[in-house]
Amino acid sequence: MIYPQTMLTVADNTGAKKVMCIRVLGGNKKYAKIGDTIIAVVKEALPNMPVKRSDVVRAVVVRTKKSIRRQDGMYIRFDDNAAVIVNMDNNPRGTRVFGPVAREIRDKNYSKIVSLAPEVL
């Protein structure tokens, strides 16, 4: 569960390393789960990259420490909270995605993120 003020690692090569959630998009949601879109501010970034520190970006949550229950009764959780930075059309701004992503990302029609990911769990 990703609340406002939660720090997330960035799972792509846009140059941002850490972002902080400042808003969960989609109605009156209190927290974001895997596949939800958030507004975040970049807290750590690499120099000379497209995304700079203190930029406000949109991101899709791809991994959470909180376990989620699937339809078949299986639970899945990850070691970190991670997000992929996207543009207004929900396409990733980076050209690579690092680490595994959950299958729920495919169900939410983020097929470009799924195709860039090395592993889908």
Curated annotation (Swiss-Prot):
Gene name per UniProt: rpl14
Source taxonomy: Eukaryota, Sar, Stramenopiles, Ochrophyta, Bacillariophyta
Domain of life according to the entry: Eukaryota
Gene Ontology cellular component annotations, sorted alphabetically: chloroplast; mitochondrial large ribosomal subunit
HAMAP family in alphabetical order: Ribosomal_uL14 (MF_01367)
Protein keywords: Chloroplast, Plastid, Ribonucleoprotein, Ribosomal protein, RNA-binding, rRNA-binding
Protein name as catalogued: Large ribosomal subunit protein uL14c
NCBIfam families to which the protein is assigned, alphabetical: rplN_bact
Keyword rRNA-binding: yes
Record localization: Plastid, Chloroplast
Assembly mode: Part of the 50S ribosomal subunit.
SMART domains linked to this entry: Ribosomal_L14
Family indicated by similarity: Belongs to the universal ribosomal protein uL14 family.
Annotated source species: Phaeodactylum tricornutum (strain CCAP 1055/1)
Molecular-function annotations in GO: large ribosomal subunit rRNA binding; structural constituent of ribosome
Pfam families: Ribosomal_L14
GO biological process, one term: translation
Main location: plastid
CDD domains found in the cross-reference section: Ribosomal_uL14 (cd00337)
